[in-house]
């Protein structure tokens, strides 16, 4: 029986991926238009060869039938292997809703898109997907969880740090050229450059979406000056936030292996100089943002203050929900990019920000697992430290599912096309595969694999948004 449980988990994961592909494909305008080329049900009249619309419609219906069989098969295996009641109960919700989804699809095919049924069709599909993700999360918890986890803070001793003792080679012992190079690199490290590419890509996606929204997908308009000022201000804002974070966490950084070599923690740079550097970056950032518009400048200031003060000083050291609430800082670049083009807020920009917000815990909890003891030494109440690894892994599945739902909503309210659909489905499946492996292997390597998969998913999704939105 135990040997069959991994098969049950695999079937649940495959069912979730199949349902998600059906839902986002059905919500994509270009694909949905092709599906509507078939106005009969359950079969389509006319030759498939030479008619792309009929071919897509047939593929969609055959895939729906295959996924339905997979969901039924997963339920049968779950019953036979003695899956937990709440797993089977959640799976039963998907089983009940699946024929409802088929019926709604039939109504859409027979009556056209100008009815309330397409919205109900999408909502029901998302509900089925959510049920399958919930069943998968609980099954993985039952299959791989442990009951003997204790909070790391009870077992890891926090070392005392002498703040007056410098660490590392003194810069004064270097040659003039080496000293200048080392100092410049130390200031560069303060800006947390690894965060810049992804956050700037978020802003770029927001601008591309907005350009398509304002001018239409066939004629997007995006001024070069807007792009340069927005991304330039974003780079400086990220640098300022990172610098302030280094200053405020300098004592804690010395306790953690991952951060003990940071420039201020090792006394490579004086706190006074680093603080002045951060202020200069913030002022320069706001100056660039202000040239775009006042709302962008206000959002940029909010991003700097939220990450530097609210997250670093209030959330991170005091609540286990620091990562979840802290996702607000990462979502602001999406709004900055959108408002830079439109000058106001609208649903697609908010939806993109929502994707980033929900993705953040699914992404960062993997890093928190890999550095669990390090965060405990720093005194941070991260999810693995406070609630254990099993609970953290389960929440990764929850937030991954929520991220994919938000990405599905995005395609239903925009004109994004097949590239976006394929990207979110394919890379979402890879991300889910990495998370399932994380549950089964429970190693640092598996946590890093899931972490990199999360980066790949979001990076590819944002690129797909830019390409799809600006494609002529």
Where in the sequence are the language-model features?
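Haloarchaeal acidic low-complexity proteome signature biased toward cell-envelope/secretome components but also
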Residues: 1-31, 76-97, 123, 127-198, ...
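Solvent-exposed interhelical
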Residues: 34, 49, 247-280, 284-285, ...
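Membrane-interface loop-to-helix entry segments
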Residues: 53-72, 117-127, 193, 323-327, ...
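Transmembrane helix-loop-helix
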Residues: 66-100, 275-317, 398-452
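Membrane-embedded alpha-helical segments that form the functional core of polytopic membrane enzymes
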Residues: 89-92, 96, 201-203, 209-245, ...
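Helix-coil boundary and interhelical linker segments in multi-pass alpha-helical membrane proteins
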Residues: 207-231, 284-298, 333-354, 408-420, ...
């Amino acid at each position: 029986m135990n040997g069959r449980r991994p098969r049950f988990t695999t079937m649940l994961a495959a069912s979730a991926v199949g349902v998600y592909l059906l839902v986002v494909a059905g919500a994509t305008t270009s694909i949905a238009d092709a599906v509507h080329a078939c106005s009969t049900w359950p079969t389509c009249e006319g030759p498939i060869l030479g008619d792309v619309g009929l071919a897509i419609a047939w593929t969609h219906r055959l895939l729906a039938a295959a996924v339905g069989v997979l969901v039924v098969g997963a339920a049968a295996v779950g019953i036979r292997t003695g899956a937990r009641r709440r797993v089977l109960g959640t799976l039963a919700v998907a089983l009940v809703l699946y024929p409802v989804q088929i019926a709604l699809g039939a109504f859409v095919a027979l009556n056209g898109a100008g009815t309330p049924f397409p919205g109900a069709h999408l909502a029901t599909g998302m509900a089925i997907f959510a049920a399958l993700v919930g069943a998968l999360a609980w099954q993985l918890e039952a299959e791989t969880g442990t009951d003997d986890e204790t909070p790391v803070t009870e077992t890891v001793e926090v070392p005392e740090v002498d703040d007056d003792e410098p660490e590392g080679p003194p810069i004064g012992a270097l040659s003039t050229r080496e000293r200048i190079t080392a100092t410049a690199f130390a200031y560069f490290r303060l800006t947390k450059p690894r965060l810049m590419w992804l956050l700037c890509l978020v802003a770029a996606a927001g601008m591309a979406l907005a350009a398509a929204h304002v001018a239409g997908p066939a004629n997007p308009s995006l001024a070069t000056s807007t792009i340069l000022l927005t991304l330039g201000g974003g780079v400086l804002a990220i640098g300022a936030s990172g610098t302030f974070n280094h200053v405020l966490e300098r004592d804690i950084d010395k306790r953690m292996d991952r951060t003990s070599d940071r420039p201020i923690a090792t006394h490579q740079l004086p706190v006074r100089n680093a603080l002045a550097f951060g202020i200069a970056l913030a002022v320069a950032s706001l100056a660039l943002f202000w040239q775009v518009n006042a709302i962008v400048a206000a959002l940029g200031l909010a991003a700097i203050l939220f990450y530097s003060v609210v997250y670093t000083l209030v959330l991170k050291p005091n609540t286990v929900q620091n990562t979840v609430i802290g996702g607000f800082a990462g979502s602001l670049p999406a709004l900055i990019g959108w408002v830079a083009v439109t000058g106001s807020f609208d649903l697609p920009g908010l939806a993109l920000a929502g994707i980033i917000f929900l993705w953040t815990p699914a992404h960062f909890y993997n890093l928190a697992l890999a550095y669990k003891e390090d965060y405990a030494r720093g005194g941070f109440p991260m999810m693995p430290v406070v609630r254990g690894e099993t609970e953290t892994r389960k929440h990764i599945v929850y937030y991954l599912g929520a991220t994919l739902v938000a990405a599905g909503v995005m395609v239903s309210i925009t004109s994004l096309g097949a590239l976006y659909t394929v990207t979110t489905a394919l890379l979402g499946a890879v991300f889910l595969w990495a998370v399932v492996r994380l549950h089964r292997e429970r190693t640092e390597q598996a946590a890093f694999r899931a972490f990199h998969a999360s980066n790949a998913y979001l990076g590819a999704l944002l690129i797909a948004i830019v390409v799809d939105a600006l494609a002529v």
